[in-house]
Design a protein with these regions (language model features):
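HKD-type phospholipase D/PLD-like phosphodiesterase module
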Residues: 1, 5, 12-142
Length: 145
């Protein structure tokens, strides 16, 4: 259980049971006094603006969007006016606890990644790491935010 910090970064975060459950875990940790930093690629946050704003309003939670869209409700317009944005993505997927342990892999956050829904299960792998690699992962959170 996190005592000091959670650094969380994902490419896709679905608004489904798994996504909402993990949001509630982050909120519970922040309410215990844990500093939470959440970094998401804005390309995959459709429908999450309200919950992300609520989370960001918590004094212990910082929400950052990588490559944020100027037009929140008309994202397609953002692609038309700035085509370079299409390939400028942040594919990081990690969950780091207290700067001591991290889970890094190919799995995003959503029912299809955890076998929790009716959708087919994506076959992705994650690894848990401790040691110097954790500091490198935390650095990437800072660089991309």
């Amino acid at each position: 259980m996190a005592e000091r910090s959670l650094d969380v970064q994902y490419y896709i975060w679905e608004d489904d049971m798994s996504g909402r459950l993990l949001f509630s875990v982050l909120l519970a940790a922040a309410s215990r006094g844990v500093r939470v930093r959440l970094l998401l690629d804005d390309n995959n946050t459709q429908g999450l603006d309200e919950i992300l704003s609520l989370l960001d309003a918590h004094p212990n939670i910082s929400v950052r969007l990588f490559n944020p869209f100027s037009f929140r409700s008309l994202r397609a317009l953002g692609y038309l006016t700035d085509f370079a944005r299409l390939n400028r993505r942040m594919h990081n997927k990690s969950f780091t606890v207290d700067g001591e342990a991290t889970i890094i892999g190919g799995r995003n956050v959503g029912d299809a990644y955890f076998g929790a829904g009716e959708e087919p299960l994506f076959s992705d792998l994650d690894v848990m790491a401790v040691g110097p690699v954790v500091k490198e992962d935390r650095k990437s959170t800072r660089l991309n935010s």
